[in-house]
């Protein structure tokens, strides 16, 4: 009788362990696919300028790791698809710059803090891809993603970090943009 109970306990324990392993696997698969989006054929990189100088280059989807206010940004895109990346920043002069920056040009004067940014794609890039981006500041933390030349930032609160992703239009990228910009 005792031997039978012992075998039953072992069997129940094995079943519970197998169930937990299967559950963990299922959760990892579901959560792991959350941000699996199509980015083939795109090489996006960007770096920011702070009072410490230029950061390292960040790749598609990486968060910039700087801890100081962003004073300038360069964004490059390398692809066989026809088109350019364009971007503009909102700084201390309380307006966006007069001219957009393109394909690796510096946006921002490297002296004034940036409060907002808008990023877009042109030509066939615009037809095939969306560009998502979000900014971080001490007051609001990470703002929601915005896309395709909409403003990200909080007017009057300097941007400290940025994250940029180029994603094929038919990808399943879950984002919300209820609070992507404040005061613009």
For each feature predicted by the language model, list its residue ranges.
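Generic short N-terminal amphipathic or hydrophobic helices
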Residues: 1, 9, 23-26, 166
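Short, flexible coil/linker elements and helix-boundary hinge sites characteristic
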Residues: 7-9, 32, 53
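Sec-dependent signal peptide cleavage junction
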Residues: 23-40
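Lectin-type carbohydrate-recognition ectodomains
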Residues: 35-184
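N-terminal Sec-pathway targeting helices
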Residues: 2-19
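Residue-level detector of intrinsically disordered/flexible regions characterized by low predicted structural confidence
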Residues: 9-11, 30, 78, 167
């Amino acid at each position: 009788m005792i031997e039978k109970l012992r075998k039953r306990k072992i069997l129940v324990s094995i079943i519970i362990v197998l169930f937990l392993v299967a559950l963990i696997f299922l959760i990892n698969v579901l959560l792991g696919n959350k941000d699996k989006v199509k980015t083939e054929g795109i090489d996006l990189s960007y770096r920011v300028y702070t009072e410490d100088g230029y950061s390292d280059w960040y790749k598609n989807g990486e968060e910039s790791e700087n801890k100081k206010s962003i004073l300038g940004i360069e964004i490059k895109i390398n692809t066989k698809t026809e088109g350019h990346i364009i971007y503009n920043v909102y700084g201390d002069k309380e307006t966006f710059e007069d001219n957009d920056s393109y394909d690796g040009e510096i946006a921002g004067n490297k002296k004034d803090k940036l409060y907002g940014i808008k990023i877009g794609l042109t030509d066939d890039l615009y037809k095939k891809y969306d560009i998502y981006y979000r900014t971080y500041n001490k007051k609001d933390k990470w703002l929601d993603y915005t896309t395709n030349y909409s403003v990200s930032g909080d007017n009057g609160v300097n941007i400290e970090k940025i994250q940029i992703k180029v994603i094929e239009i038919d990808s399943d990228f879950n984002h919300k943009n209820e609070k992507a910009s404040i005061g613009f």
